[in-house]
Amino acid sequence: MREILHIQGGQCGNQIGSKFWEVVCDEHGIDPTGRYAGTSDLQLERVNVYYNEASCGRFVPRAVLMDLEPGTMDSVRTGPYGQIFRPDNFVFGQSGAGNNWAKGHYTEGAELIDSVLDVVRKEAENCDCLQGFQVCHSLGGGTGSGMGTLLISKIREEYPDRMMLTFSVFPSPKVSDTVVEPYNATLSVHQLVENADECMVLDNEALYDICFRTLKLTTPSFGDLNHLISATMSGVTCCLRFPGQLNSDLRKLAVNLIPFPRLHFFMVGFAPLTSRGSQQYRALTVPELTQQMWDAKNMMCAADPRHGRYLTASAMFRGKMSTKEVDEQMINVQNKNSSYFVEWIPNNVKSSVCDIPPRGLSMASTFVGNSTSIQEMFRRVSEQFTAMFRRKAFLHWYTGEGMDEMEFTEAESNMNDLVSEYQQYQDATADEAEYEEEEDAIQE
């Protein structure tokens, strides 16, 4: 079967990851001890995408947990599903990365990376036909960003033909945890552009807004934010784990979403988002789901899709529904908002349908879009980066770990290139594309 190996790094990654396993265990009917306690055979049919079956009939997540300090790991271990993970798959240091990308990537992280890779290899060898890796991390700290990107590049070397999917939490525009976030994020993006296949871009502020505005939570906790993320994560892979009429997997997703190799940063959304109290009072319809799914307020990163155009998009629907209706709704969205889709990629919205809805809902949908407006995120980080880098503020923390200023300059220009690539394709029209081809022909 097509297994996915899950890796979580740093405090943010481990907190999202542990929430994700709660959701997936719940979907597959696996209790906190790893025993199956579900009600339907469908839960077990492809349980091996995310789980290994141990000799005594227990299901063990294909998860690798890493961090440079023991704190978060301890709380995962004592959390509700802490006992389900394989104890050898916890890999942690003692020193911490102190929000320093260089520590995660070059010094502390580099010392720990080999023991992480050993665990990854062991897990990969346990797979029948490994499809790819999914990595949860944040880009603002030290471990998730520095060591996370180091691990991604090492895995890329060793498994060049497997998919590499990341769920990356970007620094938020208004809420900042650390001053050096722009540095860490820019250095990470520099790596992700080259080594990842698909990046789902998340950020806390957009998630807060969803909790506050849509879910009517007055004081959202990180647990609430992570629950939103894990609903999306589970939605992206539901087609692999449950039978459906139109299946998609990580590679199909990439083929349909990535027109140019560097432009693989996606916005994600989830529907239905209703506050916990009012869920049972409304029946859901496919048109409602579709409408909410495309709504800018539903996007889990602080970029507004109305400020750009969609190169491509993909929607995964879950639940019993007619594929014909799904197709009609998707075509409807494109026809009504044609100015928000680039016209030089016809039929650029793909949909897939999986028959099993998430727990407690009759139907749901997950949205993944490749929109040029994601450049707003990069632009914002880049401006903050430049403001500090111009004065060489905080640089000594990085050069002290053996980094060179040159690396910062490279990362900065790579990110600015990315922004202008998005801008270029946002402005491109179908006639222009033909015109350019003619020009090339003349020059040849």
Swiss-Prot record:
GTP binds at Q11, E69, S138, G142, T143, G144, N204, N226. Keywords: Cytoplasm, Cytoskeleton, GTP-binding, Magnesium, Metal-binding, Microtubule, Nucleotide-binding. Mg(2+) binds at E69. Pfam families: Tubulin, Tubulin_C. The keyword Magnesium applies. The keyword Iron-sulfur does not apply. Induction: By gibberellin and brassinolide. Down-regulated by abscisic acid (ABA). It is found in: Cytoplasm, Cytoskeleton. GO terms for biological process: microtubule cytoskeleton organization; mitotic cell cycle. It comes from the Eukaryota. Expressed in roots, leaf sheaths, anthers, and suspension cultured cells. Its cofactor is Mg(2+). One of its GO terms (cellular component) is cytoplasm. GO terms for molecular function: GTP binding; GTPase activity; metal ion binding; structural constituent of cytoskeleton. Belongs to the tubulin family. Tubulin is the major constituent of microtubules, a cylinder consisting of laterally associated linear protofilaments composed of alpha- and beta-tubulin heterodimers. Microtubules grow by the addition of GTP-tubulin dimers to the microtubule end, where a stabilizing cap forms. Below the cap, tubulin dimers are in GDP-bound state, owing to GTPase activity of alpha-tubulin. Dimer of alpha and beta chains. A typical microtubule is a hollow water-filled tube with an outer diameter of 25 nm and an inner diameter of 15 nM. Alpha-beta heterodimers associate head-to-tail to form protofilaments running lengthwise along the microtubule wall with the beta-tubulin subunit facing the microtubule plus end conferring a structural polarity. Microtubules usually have 13 protofilaments but different protofilament numbers can be found in some organisms and specialized cells. PANTHER family: TUBULIN. This is Tubulin beta-6 chain.
